[in-house]
Regions:
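Short beta-strand-loop-alpha-helix junction that forms the active-site gateway
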Residues: 25, 31-38
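Short acidic-glycine loop/turn motifs at beta-strand connectors
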Residues: 22-24, 81-85
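Conserved beta-strand termini and adjacent loop/short-helix elements that scaffold enzyme active sites
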Residues: 8, 80-83, 92
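Active-site metal-binding core of divalent-cation-utilizing nuclease and nuclease-like domains
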Residues: 1-23, 27, 142
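Catalytic cores of nucleic-acid endonucleases
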Residues: 36-81
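Short catalytic-loop micro-motif centered on adjacent basic/acidic residues
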Residues: 28-30, 56-57
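A conserved mid-domain beta-alpha-beta active-site/ligand-binding segment of alpha/beta enzyme cores
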Residues: 86-161
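Acidic, metal-dependent phosphodiester-chemistry machinery of nucleic-acid enzymes
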Residues: 1, 150-181
Length: 181
């Protein structure tokens, strides 16, 4: 299947090092190099759990023995080992689905990753009203009420697959001008 990699994505009060977009799920990846500490990790874990279906932490070899004390048992753990001219990755633990966040809350968070033109496209393909002059939060709630969630997971991923960072500012301007009174 398709995969899109988005680096340094703001999520709540943290920044996800890597967000993997798959056809029906979002995966968060936190990277802790040998030079990093665990100072922000508790906050990052909470924030990742609000958005992602699965989470991994990738650690340097100095963290591999103790990282499991710092992340939940359902997070995957990957050890990155530096070789002379390459890096070797060892999966120490596979992730399990993140069921910790309330389902409704997590869907709302996932939709909040999308920009207004992307939400507008989801409304359009599902035959929904445009809700001009309504807040993003209102639109997200209406989408959640109207669109079956198994379909919505795929539509969120499709919007993120199609996202073009080179043209989005123009698309947002266009959306704003077409949604004025």
């Amino acid at each position: 299947g398709k995969v899109r990699i988005i680096e340094e994505k703001q999520i709540a009060k943290s920044r996800a090092d890597v967000m993997l977009v798959l056809e029906e799920k979002l995966i968060g990846v936190e990277i802790k190099s040998d030079a990093d500490t665990y100072a922000r990790l508790a906050r990052q874990v909470k924030d990742y759990n609000k958005f992602f279906d699965y989470n991994y932490v990738v650690v340097g070899s100095s963290h591999s023995k103790h990282i499991e004390e710092h992340v939940p048992e359902y997070w995957g753990i990957i050890e990155a080992i530096s070789k002379e001219e390459s890096v070797e990755f060892n999966v120490l633990r596979e992730p399990e689905i993140n069921k910790r966040a309330q389902r409704t809350y997590k869907m709302k968070r996932k939709l909040s990753i999308l920009w207004r033109p992307e939400l507008s496209h989801i409304q359009e393909i599902n035959g929904m009203p445009k809700y001009k002059q309504r807040s993003k939060d209102f639109v997200i709630t209406k989408i959640m009420e109207k669109v079956p969630w198994d379909l919505l997971h795929r539509q969120i991923s499709e919007e993120l697959f199609q996202r073009d960072y080179n043209t989005i500012s123009e698309a947002i301007k266009e959306w704003r001008s077409s949604n004025k009174h």
